[in-house]
Amino acid sequence: MASWPPLELQSSNQSQLFPQNATACDNAPEAWDLLHRVLPTFIISICSFGLLGNLFVLLVFLLPRRRLNVAEIYLANLAASDLVFVLGLPFWAENIWNQFNWPFGALLCRGINGVIKANLFISIFLVVAISQDRYCLLVHPMASRRRQRRRQARVTCVLIWVVGGLLSIPTFLLRSIQAVPDLNITACILLLPHEAWHFARIVELNILAFLLPLAAIVFFNYHILASLRGREEVSRTRCGGRKDSKTTALILTLVVAFLVCWAPYHFFAFLEFLFQVQAIRGCFWEDFIDLGLQLANFLAFTNSSLNPVIYVFVGRLFRTKVWELYKQCTPKSLAPISSSHRKEIFQLFWRN
């Protein structure tokens, strides 16, 4: 096949790596040319927004002199995971600009792909953990103790990072630099030692990294929404009820955005597996899967830069924390500005 997505979808067959020259099915050369021109710029844009946005989120969470609550612990870890992920994207942008001739050596070939694979697991496991915490808080509030939940959140995040790292070890070990004489390049490819690895990889990718977490996410959030609808009055009377509702709205938005960004990737990954085992055949499916994988990969990438935008526009409490951080960092010698004076300043600023 022709797919060349960075998220470890390559076959060990070299003839499946490059769309223009390496396959008998060449029905969409214009689409591939367009993708190769557009994708590097798109990747760099995602990297820039993701780097600045997630750094900003981490600063807002970590700079204030106070302890993080449970939701903030999970969201800070999610931002850290996204930040580590986007740091690897410029290498893939350069790889595409360089016609897939990997210029960074074998160690970075393994390391960058290992980081990308680890992020895939860490991100979705964190989303599951966030949903589970909201479920316990809203559906079983009497069983949730703040101090205990905070300790559990820290331990859970450490375990998620460790498990994500362990699950990325096969990628680190099986990625390699290999010459492709027909194209006169040296490519960073995934070398699967046996055909059985294709099945093991799709089980890991589609079931462990998506379907099982998706089932847990749907279960938790279904009961969260039912609890919010059925116990609205109770939530208002509980201490912190309004705050919990705002935090839950933010988390539900993050969950939906995550699923929208990542579901197409797993759909096309499963189609690729069906093509590899010849359950589906033909040039139409090959081109459809190859192009779909490329687009789905980079739709998934956007999630890492989309989360900070969600924090700002959906997270009302997050915006409050930004304002508190601003006041904390502003010199106390500066006199506070009255609302009327502030309005005059804004009018002068926006006046042409």
From Swiss-Prot:
Residues 63-72, 132-153, 228-250, 316-352 are cytoplasmic. A lipid is attached at residue 329 (S-palmitoyl cysteine). It is a multi-pass membrane protein. Keywords: Cell membrane, Disulfide bond, G-protein coupled receptor, Glycoprotein, Lipoprotein, Membrane, Palmitate, Receptor, Transducer, Transmembrane, Transmembrane helix. Glycans are attached at residues 13, 21, 184. One of its GO terms (biological process) is response to mechanical stimulus. It is found in: Cell membrane. Pfam families: 7tm_1 (PF00001). GO terms for molecular function: bradykinin receptor activity; C-C chemokine binding; C-C chemokine receptor activity. Disulfide bonds join 109-188. PROSITE patterns: G_PROTEIN_RECEP_F1_2 (PS50262). Residues 1-41, 94-110, 175-206, 272-294 are extracellular. One of its GO terms (cellular component) is external side of plasma membrane. InterPro entries: Brdyknn_1_rcpt, Brdyknn_rcpt, CCR1-9-like, GPCR_Rhodpsn, GPCR_Rhodpsn_7TM. The keyword Disulfide bond applies. The chain crosses the membrane at residues 42-62, 73-93, 111-131, 154-174, 207-227, 251-271, 295-315. Belongs to the G-protein coupled receptor 1 family. Bradykinin receptor subfamily. BDKRB1 sub-subfamily. This is a receptor for bradykinin. Could be a factor in chronic pain and inflammation. This is B1 bradykinin receptor. It comes from Chlorocebus aethiops.
